[in-house]
Curated annotation (Swiss-Prot):
Plays a role in the regulation of diverse cellular processes such as ribosome biogenesis, chromatin remodeling or protein chaperoning. Modulates the histone chaperone function and the RNA-binding activity of nucleolar phosphoprotein B23/NPM. Efficiently mediates chromatin remodeling when included in a pentamer containing NPM3 and NPM. One of its GO terms (cellular component) is actin cytoskeleton. This is Nucleoplasmin-3. Interacts with NPM (via N-terminus). Forms a pentamer with NPM at a ratio 4:1 (NPM3/NPM). Two pentamers form a decamer. Pfam families: Nucleoplasmin. The modification N-acetylalanine is found at A2. It is found in: Nucleus; Nucleus, Nucleolus. The modification Omega-N-methylarginine is found at R27. The keyword Hydrolase does not apply. Predominantly expressed in testis.
Amino acid sequence: MAAGAAAALAFLNQESRARAGGVGGLRVPAPVTMDSFFFGCELSGHTRSFTFKVEEEDDTEHVLALNMLCLTEGATDECNVVEVVARDHDNQEIAVPVANLRLSCQPMLSVDDFQLQPPVTFRLKSGSGPVRITGRHQIVCINNDLSEEESDDESEEDEIKLCGILPAKKHRGRP
């Protein structure tokens, strides 16, 4: 009877962990940490381009999420075309105009979390600016290391053996 109760308890423990994603071939997702920092640069007649680069690190992904491009103090009423130079899905360099700003009709443009993978270069293709580009630099780190506690839990689970279900004994002489 005690062996049956222990087996049932082990089974329930294993099932509750499986529902949480930790047993039976299912893995708990690796812990993810995310940091977010303000980003800003200014393009003008003196500084016509800016390149956003990051150092390559293991298990770290960088995302530049643009929020707004706007003309700042000192801008004249001319067309200011800003283009982004980045890599496409084939890893080929591609230049795409993202904003055409003019002081009298469209002095700013909200791009609502437009995400880019570094390295990214911003160029003032035409006009003299100054154009301010703002956004967020997001750093996502995935930690694939298992803690000692998780490793111990896995070794305990390997040791647990479930007893097979035996048919009930029938008593003769009882209806």
